[in-house]
Amino acid sequence: MQLKKPHFQPNKIANCIVIGGMIALGKTTIANTLANHIQAAKVVCELETNDQLVELLLAKMYERSDELLYSPLFQLYFTLNRFGKYQNNCNTINPTIFDRSIFEDWLFAKHNIIRPAVFSYYNQLWNRLAKELVNKHGVPNLYVILDGDWKLFEKRLFMRNRKVEIDNFTKNQLYFQNLHRVYTGFMEAVCNDFGINYCIIDAKLPIVTIIKMILEKLKLQKLDWKFI
């Protein structure tokens, strides 16, 4: 597996990497494990514990009770939240590992926001925020895109046993399938558009193998990071 470098190279590279990919493929576990191999690295998680607003919006979105209201609110909240997290943590003295990032939010919004006019507004907002991060703060040193087939996704989703996902799986099965079908290709396109070095890793590989592969790619970057 080769490190894939886009044709466009940005002016700024941030002091961070991102672990991204489809829902339930193990991003958080990999991010936390990887942090143990990079001196003083910190992980910025996708979901904060005890965030009642996130829990409410996530539940309402998956329940599909009022999609015209809650789906846009859900996407706007997550996008602005991740914008702030990236802005505040991407260039700290010590390396940061992000569990997903704003660069993935557009795809979720595309499949969640029903009204074209509302999505058009979101699309403009997302593009402005993403470009601001790229121009002012820099792109990640590496974007790890976890990939896996539908069976792996379904197995992992039920294994992690997040109640809101399990209870509403039938309502969201088509949504999950549509996301899964295009996720990796979309992320490749985003990385190429914004000039982000990336690699695609099979999520069904043992975590020891995945960590080894990521560390090998990071060492090729000649970063001023100390690996443990």
Swiss-Prot record:
Keyword terms of this UniProt record: ATP-binding, Nucleotide-binding
InterPro entries (UniProt xref): DCK/DGK (IPR002624), Deoxyribonucleoside_kinase (IPR050566), DNK_dom (IPR031314), P-loop_NTPase (IPR027417)
UniProt name for this protein: Uncharacterized protein MG268
Organism: Mycoplasma genitalium (strain ATCC 33530 / DSM 19775 / NCTC 10195 / G37)
GO CC term, one of those recorded: cytoplasm
Residues that bind ATP: G21, M22, I23, A24, L25, G26, K27, T28
GO MF entry, a single one: deoxynucleoside kinase activity
Cross-referenced Gene3D superfamilies: P-loop containing nucleotide triphosphate hydrolases
